[in-house]
Amino acid sequence: MNGDEVRARASELPAEPGVYQFVARDPDGTADGERVLYVGKAVDIRDRVRSYGDPRSERIAGMVARADDVTVAVTDTETQALLLEANLVKRHQPRYNVRLKDDKSYPLVQVTSHREAPRIEVTRDPDPGAAAFGPYTDKGDVETVVKAVRSVYGLRGCSEHKYRDRERPCLDYEMGLCAAPCTGAISEREYREAVESATRFFEGETGALADPLRREMAAAAQAEAFERAANLRDRLAVVEGFHEGGGAAVAAGDADAGASTDVLGVAVEGDAATVARLHAEGGQLVERDQHRLEAPQGEDRVAAVLAAFLVQYYAERDLPERILLPEPHGDDEVAAWLDAADVAVGVPGAGREARLVELALKNAHRRAGGGDELGALADALGVRRPERIEGVDVSHAQGREVVGSNVCFVDGSAETADYRRKKLDEENDDYANMRRLVGWRAERAVDGRDDRPDPDVLLVDGGRGQLDAALDAVEAAGWDGPDAVIALAKDEEVVVTPDRTYDWGSDAPQLHVLQRVRDEAHRFAVAYHRTLRDDVTTALDGITGVGPELRARLLGRFGSVAGVRQASVKDLRDVAGVGEATAETIAKRL
């Protein structure tokens, strides 16, 4: 690549955090022999890659000259980019990356596989069979959190040698950092429960550690032990912010972290679809790629794309042990094939696995979006360039468990932090439901109760009737935020505005960005509806050993009853609180 080619390629890239790779391909132009020459991270990928158009060193100039293309993977935060860069450099060992001699990796937290009393510790080299969480970028925060876990749940941190030879409790027990399982001061069952509670924190359940710390802090303040209360307050601040930096979102990081895992995201635009695949090994994200295929026509296009991709892609490749999807693929034959191959398929509804799926979706949407879609949309609608687009959709089953979704895209990419959802009154009236949902958004904006900026475009999932209902709600609330309120009908793929209907071609870039927003609003609404529906009454109800808390944990892990049904007995056992007998019972009943 020369300087002009690099700058031209940079203009096509997102101005977002992420990782970029300079790659060289075979002389025939295929990617079969693709070699990664250099891996870098950036807060703004577009700006960083543009700088390579005028390299300042001979070494980098030589790298650019050997490169044929630049590929990227977007992330939500700079921390994610930092960790992904480290993983990719380790994976590919690019020629032009400077390697540190000691090659230290980022710290992880491991809970060992010791049968009676697992140990928790910070490590860079987890033991085989251990549950590993991370990696994390701030070792100080990790050590603070592990100390908090030990003080709350009494997990041991000693070596196996010291544990075996201990006859009486050590100093950690006296300091309140260990429950002394070595001397039987705590029963094996109670210790196991403590391990499960601690594990839930590292799986993303912040309250599992924050809540007991908060109670300890309140008790210390009540007893006027103000120095201890202050120390607990500082520790609580680290715990509450531990999962917010996004550092661990590039890791599989659950009890099955050692399994090879593929995470798929889908974006459909016109007659084509993009599938982004993220691959994790040993709990760390080490590979990502994108694939284009023809999008089937019909109602559930994303599900159809997933089913087609699973068959086409894995027919010629080794299957991973686990596959995470944004929604069920809905194909019984594909499900039977994967089940026979002992592949666990899940649709995560919450936690770190759900964030991995969101990251795959973000990469799929970014790959799908080509050219200046927002500029084309502005020209087509006669409005200013819409930097912020919000989409709304309603999901229900014959008027029951009615829910609304409100998603947000900024500069053409999903802004998941600004997603909202709303449980609506039960009524089997699509127009009335849309009026309530948009009214809720509009009234909160007018009253100042919604801290999000107003959208430039508000997109309604539906046709003329849904649009009129949305416009009624906007007018009734006196909301003048959006420059345009429009609708996108599913079947006809036509854009409806107050004045006219647009029937753009399937290759129109302005249609593609609206389709991505519409499809994401639909997915988010359906996911919430599924959660509520399963919460009201599920096939899990009445199963011996499955109470409300365990039911919620199962649904959170697998996304839905369908996800639980597809899980193997081994996958079920990996959920905290599910033993061998309960797992067998669940599998048999479902």
Swiss-Prot record:
Residues 15-98 form the GIY-YIG domain. GO terms for biological process: DNA damage response; nucleotide-excision repair; SOS response. GO terms for molecular function: DNA binding; excinuclease ABC activity. Residues 207-242 form the UVR domain. Keywords: Cytoplasm, DNA damage, DNA excision, DNA repair, Excision nuclease, SOS response. Gene3D superfamilies: 5' to 3' exonuclease, C-terminal subdomain, GIY-YIG endonuclease, UvrC, RNAse H endonuclease domain. One of its GO terms (cellular component) is excinuclease repair complex. Transmembrane segments: none annotated. It is found in: Cytoplasm. Its main location: cytoplasm. CDD domains: GIY-YIG_UvrC_Cho (cd10434). NCBIfam families: PRK14668.1, uvrC. Interacts with UvrB in an incision complex. Belongs to the UvrC family. The UvrABC repair system catalyzes the recognition and processing of DNA lesions. UvrC both incises the 5' and 3' sides of the lesion. The N-terminal half is responsible for the 3' incision and the C-terminal half is responsible for the 5' incision. This is UvrABC system protein C. It comes from Halobacterium salinarum (strain ATCC 700922 / JCM 11081 / NRC-1) (Halobacterium halobium). The lineage of its organism: Archaea, Methanobacteriati, Methanobacteriota, Stenosarchaea group, Halobacteria. The gene is uvrC.
